[in-house]
């Protein structure tokens, strides 16, 4: 079991919690918890340690837990979707499913007494929720069209799966990496368009050739938090596209685990260690942990604008297509899971993929099947060609389920996009990201227009409002947007956004 290095700094409360009992220890107690019920559980186990199993206590819905899965590269099979739906249907309207900004699924409605069965059912279909919350490595993201995209440089699917298997002991839980100083995000891009937002991950691999061999440049330290936002910086390192990626990821995680600050929780992400040491020393220590000198970075190859993958696109396999469907703010019902599985089986080869824009992609659709697929009733709700504001709308969970939230996000995001679309003609999609609080789960800094929940004063009353970010650029030459307006009341937002869309994004008022 890995331990934090002895330190003179005062440990934060989560470090004390982990010292009292390792997070992963709840794995062996889940049957006991299920039998005693949530009210009788130790609050530390219930509200924090269960997150090591991906089970989240929701203060907003006491007794109804959320389960966050791990879906490497966002790739699912129809039998997995069916298994999730079969389990969730017992909860009726209490069940709902969200596609997350890390191309993952979160399931809601779960009762504690059902968790042992739930975890067994996940494992039976090759899924896991282990280590998906708290001080663990989050879902590892990759291009959602890996293996399909004719322009891709490297198919990252098996590498990402192998990395997840290594860091989680094939989904059973790996105590080497369950006591990091903080959460840790990893992304591996194999395409040309930076589809995974490499720049906002603690560790990202982006494709690059070294002496004719394809491998990855390495980026470190990207993160968002309520007090600081930092894009990843180059480690000036290159590794071949093989097991070296796993070795280097392990080395960086070990360096972070053993040296990262465990004091002020707001200063515990990887970038703070890099700041403290400087990138040269950090690189040196990582190289020692890696056990070999690191090659210098090679020229970057990502030179495409980011795609959203919606609509019909030919695959590199002749005669087959992938079809991206827009799922408004990523929200699904149990019935939707069944329907997506059915479409994948009927028209494709049983595969469904998720994107960091909270959408789905059906893959391997033969040319001849396209017209019938496009006429399926589900596609009237999950459109392959959504209107330009809905198309680019992403939203975090918000106050419906998240107790950090300062505002309701998802329903408001849909309503505002639809009302502005009805009034305006837009020359191109505009990416609007909503996030309910400064934790930035909805990534407002990568959006054309980012909306961050805030409490604002209007007419002497505190009301729900937002701070507005502008100028986020994704894909080639990605950079983060910056706060441009503060304290806009949500009820004034349609007017403010209308003006922004006209002035900056070429929107024109529709003549009725
Ligand atoms: Fe997040 C905490 C939801 C992506 C930064 N995030 C939370 C919690 C767990 C808080 C809580 O316990 O209620 C939220 C759960 C609410 C719920 O019931 O759904 C939550 N985060 C989400 C999701 C579901 C947003 C979404 O609607 O898609 C995303 C799940 C991703 C996944 O599948 O693992 C999600 N969170 C992100 C991202 C975006 C990303 O990874 O690209 C970020 C910013 C990037 C980053 O982390 O550097 C993000 N979440 C945070 C933070 C701030 C971290 C920090 O260093 O301060 C918190 C708060 C914390 O960890 O203390 C947080
Ligand atoms: Fe919750 Fe805030 Fe994250 Fe939204 S940004 S899911 S409100 S923690």
From Swiss-Prot:
Question: Which GO terms of the molecular function aspect are on file?
Answer: 4 iron, 4 sulfur cluster binding; ferredoxin-nitrite reductase activity; heme binding; metal ion binding
Query: What name has this protein been given in UniProt?
Result: Ferredoxin--nitrite reductase
Q: Does the keyword Transcription apply?
A: no
Gene for this protein? nirA
Q: Which top EC class is given?
A: oxidoreductase
Which cystines does this chain contain?
A: none
SUPFAM superfamilies documented for this protein: Nitrite and sulphite reductase 4Fe-4S domain-like, Nitrite/Sulfite reductase N-terminal domain-like
Q: Which PANTHER family match?
A: FERREDOXIN--NITRITE REDUCTASE, CHLOROPLASTIC
Which residues participate in [4Fe-4S] cluster binding?
396, 402, 437, 441
Q: Which domain of life is it from?
A: Bacteria
Q: Which UniProt keywords apply?
A: 4Fe-4S, Electron transport, Heme, Iron, Iron-sulfur, Metal-binding, Nitrate assimilation, Oxidoreductase, Transport
Q: Which positions bind siroheme?
A: 441
Question: Which GO biological process annotations does it have?
Answer: nitrate assimilation
Top-down, what is the taxonomic lineage of the species of origin? Answer: Bacteria, Bacillati, Cyanobacteriota, Cyanophyceae, Synechococcales
- Assigned EC number: 1.7.7.1
State a single Pfam family of this protein.
NIR_SIR
Swiss-Prot/TrEMBL catalytic activity: 6 oxidized [2Fe-2S]-[ferredoxin] + NH4(+) + 2 H2O = nitrite + 6 reduced [2Fe-2S]-[ferredoxin] + 8 H(+)
UniProt record similarity statement? Belongs to the nitrite and sulfite reductase 4Fe-4S domain family.
